[in-house]
Every structure is written in C-alpha cells, then in structure tokens.
Amino acid sequence: MHREGHLDDAYWALRLSLGSTAFLAGLDKFTNLLTNWDKYLAPQVREKLPVSGRKFMYGVGIIEMLVGVGILTRTPKLASYTASAWLLSIAAELALNGDYDIAVRDVNMAIAAYALARSEGERQHASEAEYGEDAGLERVA
C-alpha cells in the first residue's frame, strides 16, 4: 500500500470515529444510557443558564448530532473545526467542575478533530490539483 493509502486509512478512521462519537454522544443526551450528562454541568455554568440544565443538555445533544452528521457526510471540514472548538469549550467547562481526566480526553479529541479538518483541506486541495477547479463535476459526469 502506498503512502496515500495509509493516509487515506487514517483520514477515514478519524472521520468515522469522531463523527459517530459526536452523533452518539448527542443522541445520548436524550436517553442518558451511557451516563447522566447533567452531572458534568458545572454549578457555575448551571446557575447562569436561562433554561434548566436538562433543557441545556438537550440543546447540546442537538448540536453534537448535527456536528456528527456533518463530519460523516458533506461538510467534514467545517464540522471538524466546529467539533474541535466545541470539544475545547467542553474541556474548559469540565475543568471548572473538577473533571480533569475527562477534560484531558476532550482536549485530545479536539486535537484529533483539528487534524481531521486539516487533512480534509489537504484532500480538497489535492483533488482540485488533480481534477481541476470543477473536480466534483468531472467525477460525476
């Protein structure tokens, strides 16, 4: 397998794992099967919310599902940058709550999402260089 094949494998591993994790974590905000997500909401944050912590988590879930779908479908670059920023903000909130171990994991996932966004940009650039500006149209025709 050439270098491009290995890079393609890494790209798809990141894309599938980050996209499915974001979607499933978002979906779980409605079921709490994996964990009770409300316990991760820092009291300092909860008291400033205009809605209940539960309703806030529903909103978080919707955003996470949209980001997951974006990574898995037609907007992986934008969705990955969004996931990266989102995960960093979650890590900061977790640190406020003293959940440092989970915050560190979220920082690592944020870095992975950033790497995915960057590699998607490189893939787009390589595709345009190989097929021209109308790369998408030529491949469909």
Per-region residue spans from a language model:
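Membrane-interface extramembranous regions
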Residues: M1-A141
